Amino acid sequence: MFKVIKCNELNEKLIDKKVEINAWVKKIRHHGKFIFLNIRDRYEKAQVLVNEEKLLKIAEKIKLEYCIKIQGLLIKRPPNMINANMKTGHFEILAKNIEIISKCNELPFMIEDDNNASENSKLEYRYLDLRRDSLKNKIILRCQATHLIRNFLIKRKFLELETPTFVKSTPEGARDFVIPSRIHKGSFYALPQSPQLYKQLIMIAGFDKYFQIARCYRDEDSRGDRQPEFTQLDLEMSFVKKENIFKLIENMLFLIFKNCININLPKKFKKITYKKAMNKYGSDKPDTRFELELQDISRNLKNSEFNIFKDTLKNKGSIKILIVKDKADKFSRAKINNLEEIAKLYKTQGLYFTKIENNKFSGGIAKFLKTEEQELIKTYSLENNDIIFFTANNNWETACKAMGQIRIKIANDLGLIDENKFEFLWVYDFPLFEYDENTKTYSPAHHMFSLPKKQYIANLEKNPKKTIGEIYDLVLNGVELGSGSIRIHNKELQQRIFKIIGFQKEKSEDRFGFFLKALEYGAPNHGGIAIGIDRLIMLMTKSTSIKDVILFPKNSFAASPLDNSPSKISNEQLKELGINIVDGDN
């Protein structure tokens, strides 16, 4: 009787015992009167020795990635044949029976990490690519993480509830994927960009703790960290403040990182306001794995004769600097030109620099800083071989963002980023609105259901631009991992927000009437967050693309080479739906 086991179950106790394993053939080695088959299942690899004449005839027909059943005797390898790189490298199975379960066609690419297959080819044969250990292990880790999330939240009395995937189209910034209704011709459902409104309705229904591993959909251009369909941990709680949500997420992530990749996170994550993050790092999702920080030098240059700085300060703009210690010799003219191109992209008044040599400014704009030279050297503790970069703009945010991108570029070029670090950061107190100078209109900075901070509510309409919301983001290594807020639970306040962003009563009733009605029936104060599962696993596994951690992702054109979707449908289907296809060129 053969004991059915998996490859990882081979051990000393099974020596000289009969075992049976079902697996795929990873490698074949012919050695005259015997053949070695390296086999693989989901759990591990193992080696099979074939030396009986009748079995050799079968083994000679076997090719790579055949699915086979092996029955045999587990034996120890000779000392000179032990493979220390395999967990099962001390054993091999002496084959007694071989059954070919299924053959495999000629492979489109080798099932190895260093194959040169194109992305489209790998996606077309995703079921083969998933046999690679590195890819397989990422998917398994994802499964472990979501299992931990569920257990963690259920233990804390959260309810896992499912919200609809056919919803009313209420665009949240990106385009909706729409679904035509056959029954209601001319009408459309949308696939949800998030369960936002439904999770708020769940709070109004009295379920005070909700979560969902939610599938979400956005019709936007694909890029490295985005897909048209994605997964997020969506959760909401009644009667909470943001600090309650911070603590919950910190404890959950501590558990996930410890159990999945054996990393001990701090029990509490660092926190910073949006304004401080912009001033210090030039980003609302700063990478804090390195210390390179922005500083505002406007006060020190208030009497500057350099026209760019003089005009900026006259217009109440901002001058930002970045000091790189003891690295001036690393910045050639060509490298500085590359940094200047980044500044141009952000339409700043340019990027300027000077170096410190012989305790004086040298090169760049040194000649324009003679008056302030010694004061700046003393104030900023400048030393020989330091270099200072300056950028100026009439708009504070533009100056910050430009220098923030330059900060990242410098850190990458100088190797300042510790790739083994996991640096979490809460960014909070975001502006509630964004203002478009061209259209002279306001739009939500995050979404239109976030609560303004208490001190801004009374005079909300007088100065929307300065209104701060109860909004927070969770950042990991410079990537926005999650976003949340305390929500509006008052109909009147929600209507005021709608009006500021240009939704007059008729429009707000048409799009959100069902939700406004619900706010009239005893809505609790509530708040929540959504954490991107795909991004989380991508960062935990140090993957370069989000596609690596999704089982069946789309390519960069939001298409699937595996099943050739999206595809055209028949004229009969179109007729049933009441749809006519119009040539886009007409």
Curated annotation (Swiss-Prot):
The keyword Nucleus does not apply. Pfam families: GAD, tRNA-synt_2, tRNA_anti-codon. InterPro entries: Aa-tRNA-synt_II, aa-tRNA-synth_II, aa-tRNA-synth_II/BPL/LPL, Asp-tRNA-ligase_1, Asp-tRNA-ligase_1_N, Asp/Asn-tRNA-synth_IIb, AspRS_core, GAD-like_sf. It is found in: Cytoplasm. GO terms for molecular function: aspartate-tRNA ligase activity; aspartate-tRNA(Asn) ligase activity; ATP binding; nucleic acid binding. Its main location: cytoplasm. Residues 196-199 are annotated as: Aspartate. It comes from the Bacteria. L-aspartate binds at E172, R218, H446, R487. The keyword Ligase applies. It catalyses: tRNA(Asx) + L-aspartate + ATP = L-aspartyl-tRNA(Asx) + AMP + diphosphate. Homodimer. Aspartyl-tRNA synthetase with relaxed tRNA specificity since it is able to aspartylate not only its cognate tRNA(Asp) but also tRNA(Asn). Reaction proceeds in two steps: L-aspartate is first activated by ATP to form Asp-AMP and then transferred to the acceptor end of tRNA(Asp/Asn). Belongs to the class-II aminoacyl-tRNA synthetase family. Type 1 subfamily. PANTHER family: ASPARTATE--TRNA LIGASE, MITOCHONDRIAL, ASPARTYL/LYSYL-TRNA SYNTHETASE. This is Aspartate--tRNA(Asp/Asn) ligase. It comes from Borreliella burgdorferi (strain ATCC 35210 / DSM 4680 / CIP 102532 / B31).
